[in-house]
Regions:
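Signature of N6-adenine DNA methyltransferases within the class I
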Residues: 2-23, 30, 36-64, 71-203
């Protein structure tokens, strides 16, 4: 097996338990995108759907049927009802140059993790009423390097679910303090379901 490219490609793959929990949070039918499918943890569950697409940058680990491309380079023809996945966690200084050259750095600095750019672009790829269901480090909620992202999320909808797992090891061998969360475009309820109950989340 090829070693995980943790530093440069952020390849920390998703367990079945996490995949099932995230798929259960899905509220939309229709088109679905997995923007960084890795070895196919999510893709294996959704690939038979009529309007499903998965993208993976690394051809050596990509699941069968996935499109081999850099997510930031691919020109999408359509928007999506659901975008789901586990975007790569890569510190700014470790982002491969080919990918870095594709990123819009106008609103971000050198503290920004690659997963932040994934979230930003995914917002733009949502249909009206579309949803993002991601597992990411929880820190983007209050990180100053993510101020633009949080403003964009707030202006476009609501994080309807935010499950903070703290130090629980969601990934085998890795514990990056993650949260599983759902964002809904054009929903302005400002109500977020957490493990502790529903609360108002102001980003």
């Amino acid at each position: 097996m090829k070693p995980y490219e943790v530093e440069s490609l952020g390849q920390v793959f998703t367990t079945d338990e996490v995949v099932e929990k995230m798929l259960a949070m899905r509220e939309n039918t229709g088109s679905i995108l997995e923007p960084s499918c890795g070895d196919g943890a999510f893709w294996s569950k959704i690939q038979t759907e009529k309007h499903a697409l998965a993208i993976e940058i690394d051809p050596t680990i990509a699941a069968p049927g996935a499109l081999i491309s850099d997510f930031f380079e691919y020109k999408f023809k359509n928007k999506f009802n659901t975008i789901i996945g586990n975007p790569p966690y890569v510190g700014f200084k470790k982002i491969p140059k080919n990918t870095l050259d594709l990123l819009n750095l106008e609103y971000y600095d050198k503290r920004t993790n690659l997963y932040t750019f994934f979230i930003d672009r995914c917002i733009d790829l949502l249909e009206d009423g579309g949803e993002i269901i991601f597992v990411t480090p929880r820190s983007f909620i209050n990180a100053t390097s993510c101020a633009h992202l949080n403003s964009k999320l707030y202006e476009n909808g609501t994080i309807t679910h935010f499950y903070d797992y703290g130090d629980k090891m969601l990934f085998k061998g890795f514990s990056p303090n993650c949260a599983i969360w759902r964002f809904e475009k054009d929903c302005f309820s400002r109500q977020t379901l957490t493990k502790e109950g529903t609360r108002t989340m102001n980003l």
